């Protein structure tokens, strides 16, 4: 009988409208995304980058540990030996459509050459734009070097 009276007097509808009115005047919990951005964690794993030393030489020593540890097999490296006997990469490609952003490549790198940067806005309309070559990765590293160095310095104790 009581359920009949509740439905007769539209109790559920009034209760739902009261809840709507309660939240209508409260502060919004969402952000207006392209115009406002939420803070990003220091350990955020975003777009990949290759770093350089202070003298401008690339850090990658072509050890291929990142290629070996990548569970998605998104990294392809080809290396060549230089005149002084050291090895450097001639090709360093990352297929961002395969990458699962696990960070294992960054953890495996003995010289902190490959890192995951702070950028998460790199959507593209074509598949080929998401296959990063060595030049694109070095450009990313040059663009974010200060932020990447600060991030690695803060995280140094935990590595």
Swiss-Prot record:
Cofactor note: Binds 2 [4Fe-4S] clusters per subunit.
Subunit relationships: NDH-1 is composed of 14 different subunits. Subunits NuoA, H, J, K, L, M, N constitute the membrane sector of the complex.
Residues noted as binding [4Fe-4S] cluster 1 in the record, renumbered to the chain: 60, 63, 66, 109
Protein name from the UniProt record: NADH-quinone oxidoreductase subunit I
Principal EC category: translocase
Residues that bind [4Fe-4S] cluster 2: 70, 99, 102, 105
GO cellular component assignments: plasma membrane
EC numbers for this chain: 7.1.1.-
Required co-factors: [4Fe-4S] cluster
């Amino acid at each position: 009988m009581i359920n009949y009276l509740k439905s007769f007097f539209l109790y559920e509808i009034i209760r739902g409208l009261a809840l709507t009115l309660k939240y209508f005047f409260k502060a919004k919990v969402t952000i207006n995304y392209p115009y406002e951005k939420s803070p990003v964690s220091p350990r955020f794993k975003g777009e990949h980058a290759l770093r350089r030393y202070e003298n401008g030489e690339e850090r990658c020593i072509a050890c291929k540990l990142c290629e070996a540890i990548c569970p998605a097999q998104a990294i392809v490296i080809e290396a060549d030996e230089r005149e002084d006997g050291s090895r450097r990469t001639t090709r360093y490609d990352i297929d961002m459509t395969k990458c699962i952003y696990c960070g294992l490549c960054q953890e495996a790198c003995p010289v902190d050459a490959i890192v995951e940067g702070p950028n998460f806005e790199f959507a593209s309309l074509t598949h080929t734009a998401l296959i990063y070559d060595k030049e694109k990765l070095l450009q990313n590293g040059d663009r974010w070097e200060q932020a990447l160095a600060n991030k690695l310095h803060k995280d140094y104790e935990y590595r």
